[in-house]
Regions:
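Catalytic grooves of carbohydrate-active enzymes
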Residues: 10-19, 25-38, 122-133, 186-299
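Acidic, contiguous internal or C-terminal segments within carbohydrate-active enzymes
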Residues: 420-466
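Acidic-and-aromatic substrate-binding clefts and catalytic sites of carbohydrate-active enzymes
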Residues: 16-25, 45-57, 78-82, 136-145, ...
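Beta-strand-rich recognition/accessory modules
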Residues: 230-235, 239, 259-261, 472-511
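Acidic-aromatic substrate-binding/catalytic surfaces of carbohydrate-active enzymes
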Residues: 339-421
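Catalytic domains of cell-wall/extracellular-matrix polysaccharide-remodeling enzymes
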Residues: 109-183, 440-445
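Active-site beta->alpha N-cap acidic-glycine motif
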Residues: 1-69, 255-260, 329-331
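Metal-dependent polysaccharide deacetylase catalytic core of the NodB/CE4 family, i.e.
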Residues: 48-139, 195-226, 252-265, 374-375, ...
Length: 511
C-alpha cells in the first residue's frame, strides 16, 4: 500500500518585532482547538526563546492533544544566544532578526552551532523531561544535522520548500518534495550512499504547487508563494487540486505534504485558511486519500523502510490556474528533474545533479550576508537561466519538410504501475515520444520516422563542453558530468547544445 502522508507542523515564535500588535498565543490556542476537534496527531516546534519566556511549556503540559508531538524550531534569537553564551549576529535592539546571518545556524561558527544546539536541547529537557525527536528550521546545515543525529538521535528534520530569494532564502535545486537522507557535506542534497548520508529523514515543507511554484515570477521579495500556507491558501478548490496532484497518481512508494503555520502571522490572517484546511484534511482522511502523521512518526516510518533515499515522483495533471499546464517531478539520490506540458508541447524545465563532492557553502565557514544560497549542480535550469521571459528548457526537435520543428502532442498518458519509475508517453502528428525516469537515468525516445535531436540551452558560465558520451559542467568550482548514450553527434551554438539522436536509438542521460 502506497503511503499518502500529511504532517501538520505548527512552529512557535516568542515575538516578531515587525508586527508588535500580533497576539502570538491566540493562534496556538485556536490551532490546538481545531487539531483536538479532528483528533489529528500534530507537531509543535518551539523556538528556544518561546520555551524560555513564553507560556507554551505550561500550556502544552496542560492541554497538548493526545498523540501530538513537541519539538524544536531551531531559529536563532538573541535570548537563545544569551543562553548559549554566543554572540547574536542580528541587529541591535531586536530579539529575532529573520536575516540569514542571524536566524539560521549557518550564521554561526561550528563551535557556536554546537553551543546553540546544546542550549536548546537542555532547555527543552528541563521543561519536558525528555529530548525531542523532531528538530527543524528553514535551513539547517549538514554539520548541525550531523551533530543532532550523532548525539541526540533525532528521527526527523525539515527545511523550507524549494524557492529562490523569498525572505532572503534561496534553497534551490535539491530534492523537490518528500524526504531524503541529507549528504554529510551538503544538507540541500541527498547522500548518494549510506556512508555519505546523515541518517535523519529531511522533509520538505509548505506544500508547494508542483505546477506553478517552480517558475513563479521573481519580485522584490524573491519568488511568489504558491503553497498550502494558510495565510495564502484559503481556497478549498486549490487545496483539493494540490492533494490530487500530490496523492492521486503515485508512481513511487509514497508522497508527503506539510500543513500548518507559524504563530507570528496572527490568527486573524490565517484563520480562514487554517479552518478550511483542517476541514478538507479531515474529509481526505475519511475518504482514504491521506493520513496524518506527526513529523517524528513520519521520520520513524521512513527510517524503518529505507536504508538510502528512495525515488519520489509527482504526477501533477491539474493546474489550479487557467493556463492548464501539467508537471511531472522525479527525485532520486542522484538527480532531480521536472517535465512540463504546455498545450501540445513538452519540455524538460529542470535537471539538477546530486554529487556529494559538492559541499554546501556554509559547511565550515559562516554566512555573513542577509541572503543565503543553498543549491545543487544544474544541467537544465529553466527558471534561473531564462532570457526575456523565455524559459531555458530542454526540448525535442524533429526534422519536418527540411527544417527542425518542435513536435506537437495531442494525447498524454502516465504509467504509474511501475517499480519506482516514472513513464510518460505522448502522441501527435509528429509521432510518439516516451520519457522514462529511473533512479539513475532519464530516457527519451521519439518514434517519428524522421531524424530528431535534443536542444539543450546552456549557461556559458557553467557549461564547459559536449562530447558524444558526456556533457561537462562546472559550478562554484565543482566540475561534474552527465553521461550520454544514443547520441550520434553534437553541435554547439552560443546559447545551446544540439544532441543528434542516433537512428532507432533512445537517448539516455546519466546525471
Amino acid at each position: 500500500m502506497k503511503k499518502k502522508i500529511c504532517s501538520i507542523i505548527n512552529f512557535i515564535r516568542l515575538e516578531d518585532h515587525r508586527m508588535p500588535e500580533i497576539d502570538h498565543l491566540e493562534p496556538v490556542m485556536e490551532q490546538m482547538k481545531l487539531i483536538g476537534k479532528y483528533r489529528f496527531p500534530a507537531t509543535w516546534l518551539m523556538q528556544t526563546d518561546a520555551m524560555l519566556e513564553g507560556p507554551y511549556p505550561e500550556l502544552f503540559q496542560r492541554e497538548l492533544p493526545e498523540g501530538n508531538e513537541l519539538g524544536i524550531w531551531l531559529e536563532i534569537t538573541r535570548l537563545h544566544c544569551e543562553a548559549a553564551g554566543v554572540e547574536f549576529r542580528g541587529r541591535d535592539g531586536v530579539n529575532w532578526d529573520h536575516h540569514s546571518q542571524a536566524s539560521l545556524t549557518i550564521g554561526y561558527r561550528r563551535s557556536e552551532r554546537i553551543a546553540l544546539v546544546e542550549a536548546s536541547m537542555k532547555i527543552f529537557h528541563e521543561k519536558f523531561g525528555y529530548y525531542p525527536r523532531s528538530v527543524a528550521a528553514w535551513y539547517l546545515d549538514a554539520f548541525t544535522l550531523g551533530y543532532l543525529e550523532e548525539k541526540y538521535h533525532i528521527t526527523a528534520t525539515a527545511n523550507c520548500r524549494d524557492q529562490w530569494g523569498t525572505d532572503g532564502y534561496s534553497i534551490w535545486g535539491g530534492f523537490w518534495a518528500g524526504a531524503y537522507y541529507p549528504s554529510r557535506g551538503n544538507a540541500n542534497l541527498p547522500g548518494e550512499d549510506e556512508s555519505g548520508q546523515i541518517r535523519v529523514p529531511l522533509f520538505r515543507m509548505l506544500g508547494s504547487c508542483p505546477v506553478n511554484q517552480y517558475d513563479s515570477s521573481l519580485g522584490e521579495n524573491g519568488q511568489g508563494v504558491c503553497t498550502l500556507e494558510p495565510t495564502a491558501c484559503k481556497d478549498p478548490r486549490w487545496m483539493k487540486i494540490l492533494f490530487r496532484n500530490m496523492f492521486g497518481n503515485l508512481a513511487t512508494d509514497y508522497s508527503y505534504v506539510q500543513l500548518g503555520q507559524e504563530n507570528s502571522f496572527g490568527w486573524p490572517r490565517m484563520k480562514d485558511g487554517y479552518v478550511m484546511q483542517m476541514e478538507e484534511l479531515a474529509k481526505a482522511c475519511a475518504a482514504g486519500e491521506a493520513e496524518v502523521m506527526t513529523m517524528g512518526d513520519s521520520g520513524e516510518w521512513f527510517l524503518s523502510n529505507y536504508r538510502v533515499t528512495p525515488p519520489l515522483a509527482t504526477v501533477a495533471l491539474e493546474d489550479p490556474e487557467p493556463a492548464g499546464r501539467q508537471a511531472f517531478w522525479y527525485n532520486s539520490r542522484y538527480y532531480r528533474a521536472s517535465l512540463t506540458r504546455r498545450g501540445k508541447h513538452l519540455a524538460l524545465r529542470d535537471l539538477h545533479c546530486f554529487d556529494n563532492r559538492y559541499r554546501e557553502t556554509y559547511l565550515e565557514s559562516r554566512c555573513h550576508t542577509h541572503a543565503m544560497i543553498a543549491d545543487a549542480l544544474p544541467v537544465v535550469e529553466g527558471f534561473l537561466w531564462q532570457k526575456n521571459g523565455v524559459p531555458a528548457e530542454m526540448k525535442i526537435e524533429v526534422q519536418d519538410s527540411g527544417s527542425w520543428k518542435e513536435p506537437e502532442f495531442d494525447t498524454l498518458s502516465v504509467d504509474t504501475a511501475t517499480d519506482n519509475r516514472l513513464e510518460i508517453m505522448a502522441s501527435g502528428k509528429n509521432g510518439t515520444v516516451f520519457w522514462c525516469f529511473t533512479e539513475s537515468s532519464v530516457m527519451i525516445r521519439l518514434d517519428a520516422g524522421a531524424p530528431w535531436r535534443i536542444l539543450l540551452p546552456v549557461n556559458p558560465e557553467v557549461f564547459r563542453r559536449a562530447e558524444p558520451e558526456k556533457l561537462v559542467f562546472e559550478h562554484n568550482g565543482c566540475v561534474y558530468e552527465t553521461g550520454l548514450s544514443g547520441i550520434s553527434g553534437t553541435d554547439e551554438t552560443e546559447t545551446a547544445v544540439l544532441l543528434e539522436a542516433a537512428s532507432g536509438k533512445a537517448v539516455h542521460f546519466y546525471p
